[in-house]
Regions:
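Bacterial Sec-dependent N-terminal signal peptides
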Residues: 1-24
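Structured helix-beta-strand junction loops
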Residues: 7, 57-58, 92-93
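N-proximal helix/coil linker or "cap" segments that precede and/or mark the start of modular domains
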Residues: 20-41
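A short beta-strand-turn-helix
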Residues: 41-61
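Short active-site neighborhood of thiol/selenol oxidoreductases, capturing the structured segment around
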Residues: 57-71
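The canonical Cys-X-X-Cys-His
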Residues: 70-73, 126
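Typically the conserved alpha-helix immediately C-terminal to a functionally engaged Cys/Sec
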Residues: 74-89
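Thioredoxin-like thiol-disulfide oxidoreductase module
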Residues: 86, 91, 95-143, 147-155
Length: 164
């Protein structure tokens, strides 16, 4: 009996240590990544500005919902803004905006108008608007995830409008 108790304690101790080191790694990773969300910003007003720009540029608007608190949000942003191929697709087809959702600013007016798929799917989540501001699609990121990041090919298909 003591042997089984000792084994159980060792396993629990290892799980706690792994959990703590994993949490510490995420905190360190978040500290190194750019923070693209602006909690002080009026999201709906910014989207309205982007619609005017999208009409001029003949582009869609890709809205990434999340916050600087979300490591997966930061990972996605980092991938699409640092990978040359993904960045080129993003810049050619979209105006890219980070709509903040956090305790400091839940952007309730923007979500009242467009919905918040993050509440259903988790964060980040995406809204795709046409150049007139009409909602074309909502998207979760779960199907683009890989271990500790995103699958570049799946993200590319998403940006090209081919990920189903």
């Amino acid at each position: 009996m003591k042997k089984y108790l000792l084994i159980a304690l060792i396993i629990c101790g290892n799980l706690v240590a792994f959990s703590q080191s994993s949490s510490e790694q995420i905190i360190q990773e978040k500290a190194t990544l750019p923070k693209p969300y602006h909690p002080e910003e009026d999201g709906l007003a910014r989207i309205e500005e982007l619609i005017l720009q999208a009409k001029k540029d003949n582009k869609k608007i890709l809205i990434q919902i999340g916050g600087n608190w979300c490591v997966w949000c930061l990972r996605f942003n980092h991938l699409v803004t640092t990978d040359p191929e993904l960045k080129a697709i993003l810049e050619k087809k979209y105006l890219y905006y980070h709509l903040n959702y956090s305790p400091e600013n839940k952007n309730e007016k923007a979500f009242a108008k467009y919905g918040n798929p993050g509440e259903k799917y988790g964060y980040p989540a995406f809204l795709v608007l046409d150049k007139k501001g009409y909602l074309l699609a909502t998207r979760k990121t779960e199907d683009m995830e890989a271990i500790n990041g995103y699958d570049k090919d799946k993200v590319k298909k998403f940006l090209q409008g081919r990920l189903k």
